Amino acid sequence: GVYNTYGYYFGKIHVDPSNSQKIYTYGVPILTSDDGGKTFYRIGKENVHADHHDLWINPDKPGHLINGNDGGVNITYDDGKNWIKNNSTEVGQFYAINVDYQKPYNVYGGLQDNGVWMGPHNSLVNKRWNMTGQYPWKGILGGDGMEVQIDNRNPNIVFTGYQFGFYSRLDLGSGKRKSIKPSHELGQSPFRFNWQTPILLSPHNQDVLYLGSNFLHKSINQGDDWENISEDLTNGGKKGNVPYGTITTISESPIKEGVLYVGSDDGMIHVTKNGGKTWNNISGNLPQDLWVSNVYASNHNEKVVYLSLDGYRWDNFSPYLFQSKNYGKTWVSISSNLPDSPINVVIEDNVNQDILYIGNDHGVYISFDQGKTWEPFKKGLTSAAVHDLVIQEEEQHLLVGTHGRSIYLADIALIQNHDIDNLLADIKIFDVKDVRFSERWGTKRSTDINYFTPSLKFSIFSKSSHKASFEIINNDKDVLFSQSISLDKGYNFIDYNLTILDDADIDLND
């Protein structure tokens, strides 16, 4: 064989269109042959990621290749002797994200075959780091990066890992790392860990850590020791090349310690109200045998819990989303007008209990009435599968982790202050911030720099999409500025640079 490892589902073979003796083959490595396949050699270099998915061969210029791999895109003009890594498009495939509460706060995320990264939320996308050598984001673990939990007492203590439950406790201050994966006892069957093993720090005690295999494991010392606090919470394993019959999601009520929900890849949902002493199966009146993509205990009501199921593995793309108001004893569908697309995550707003957010395979949707109706919430968001959502409560930011287009951020302060009056009014204009005059307005330091102009952002809620006239009027009813605008249904944001009409009848010296 040519490979020393598997080609997997992405293994392919190409023949150079300008040279029948030139062959390229790739899967985990990328290889080439100059003699029709008699001998092969590697052409991947240190800045070329493994797991190669596609290759373009320039038919008019031998040796010019464009390679798509798990690290993005690489380009060579000399048949792989040297490669350029193309970082101009954000294509990170995040499985899970999280935030801390430093100032400025950091965002963390686990990426498909690109490890776990962290960086400041306010870092701008630009190429300045190529000059300074100081890239604002940094990798903190390798492998297929998975879920991340941060100790809210000491943000240097981070719990994260890679596929199939290989989690560690990291001390970012000292650089120390300790493996914390639970192990079965001698004579027991090995635990089954999902590819994306769920992990959760208790919101009530940051020394308490939960981790799911086919059992729920609990540690009271941040992963140094573990105890099983459940029986097998799945329907049992199945033979295959990856473990099946595994826990996929864990949630603890932030209101009541010990109220825990667990979901599995074979459609099982369980609840305990006493920290694992007893468990109840609460999946009875739900669609059966689907993947439990997310379970979410309410921030506002101890009895309320939300649940999403995913059926795409069985060619079922229906949106399965449910709410329970009695610890999962009975469930009500709240998918209402959501489109046919698998739902990967559901969360509740931390300020307004009526507001829910979901991420599906095409974007983000928002409900202002606990799921009775849904609206797209994706202006400025590239169409991509959304795998995780998290709210940074102090800054009132919604972070969106996509599996294909990296991470997005939205300011949700206005949304969190949403009330029924906004929905009833045709148009509502929210209060604007005061603007302080500056002598710099209308000036610039040199001819190659734009004029310094002030800016004022207006936030407008519209009941429908339509054309409107936007006017700025002073206390004397003088029209200072007028412009035709298009309002979308929902929230709109208009930047106004404080210019006034040439024929405005005002005295600028007043």
Which positions does each model-derived feature cover?
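Outer-membrane beta-barrel proteins
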Residues: 187, 446-448, 484
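A structural detector for beta-sheet-dominated domains
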Residues: 430-433, 463, 473, 486-488, ...
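Beta-strand-rich binding/interaction modules
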Residues: 168-170, 456-481
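Extracellular acidic loop/turn motifs
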Residues: 18-20, 255, 465, 501-504
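Glycine-centered tight-turn motifs at strand-turn-strand junctions
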Residues: 479-510
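Contiguous beta-strand segments within globular domains
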Residues: 441-466, 493
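Hydrophobic beta-strand positions in extracellular immunoglobulin-like domains
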Residues: 201, 460-462, 498
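Beta-propeller blade termini and top-face loops
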Residues: 1-444, 453-454
